[in-house]
Amino acid sequence: MLKLNKINEVKKYVDEWKKEGLTIGLVPTMGCLHEGHKSLIDRAVKENDKVIVSVFVNPTQFGPNEDFDKYPRSIENDVDLCNKAGVSIVFNPDPKEMYFHDACTYVNVENLTDGLCGAKREGHFRGVCTVVSKLFNISQATRAYFGQKDAQQLAVIKRMVRDLNFNVEIVGCPIVRESDGLAKSSRNKYLSKEERVEALVLSRGLRKGKELLYGGIRKTSKIKETIENEIKKSHLGKIDYIEVVDSITLEPVENIERDVLVAIAVFIGKTRLIDNFIFKLGE
């Protein structure tokens, strides 16, 4: 396995692989890899001849009051995990390598980024789409792998790929959870022992909402109210949003007549956590 930090170095290997007719899987990450990331990497290794894992804490997707400087980094552990998983290249560039000092070109997906996380994190998805576009160009990936936990990101990337005719297949992978139900996240490292226990209100709230949906309730307001009541049982929890939206367009719905995404964001102490599930009508 190779650990590279220069774009041209990655391109050199990609060109060789393409000449040989090999398929390439890309797993874009911000590092601090956990079992959720590993599930993406394992699938990429299984489905492609070569796999590139990018480890890059992307400054352009963090707002001015967000946790860029504090975001957990563990490159040695990340490289070890990737090596054991059968990854071909770990791409770990510096921000100066990814962005020219006078860069003025960005990729922005409209409408889908207006709600959910996009409503509170101005510029976040512009940063995500720009860096992912660059990674697509650098890697020339056959397939790229994203987790369902970042459901809005997955929907936005799919739309960007469609609209801009990127020649890459987007593969969405299921949420990986701890044994007690908490969705795996790099930000879980921020949680104190007490906060870690309180964080379970996210998965419990979603489970309550899911029970109503599978029990035949179709009124969005009832679903949201039930989830809200469960989350409010935590004295450390502060709700950012609870939304029920169309699973494709991400537009809010009042009565559930098609597949929907039920998504929540909650602050546990100072740590913002997200979780979600997709309800498919007819299942």
From Swiss-Prot:
EC number: 6.3.2.1
Residues where (R)-pantoate binds: Q61, Q153
Entry's Gene Ontology molecular function annotations: ATP binding; pantoate-beta-alanine ligase activity
Pfam families in the cross-refs: Pantoate_ligase
Extra remark beyond the main annotation: The reaction proceeds by a bi uni uni bi ping pong mechanism.
Tagged with keyword Cytoplasm: yes
Stated name of the protein: Pantothenate synthetase
Domain of life: Bacteria
Protein residues bound to beta-alanine: Q61
Gene: panC
InterPro entries (UniProt xref): Cyt_trans-like (IPR004821), Pantoate_ligase (IPR003721), Pantoate_ligase_C (IPR042176), Rossmann-like_a/b/a_fold (IPR014729)
Gene Ontology cellular component annotations, sorted alphabetically: cytosol
CDD domains, sorted: PanC
Binding, ATP: 30-37, 147-150, 176, 184-187
Catalytic reactions on record: (R)-pantoate + beta-alanine + ATP = (R)-pantothenate + AMP + diphosphate + H(+)
Record note on quaternary structure: Homodimer.
Cellular localisation: Cytoplasm
Residues the record marks as active site: H37
HAMAP family: PanC
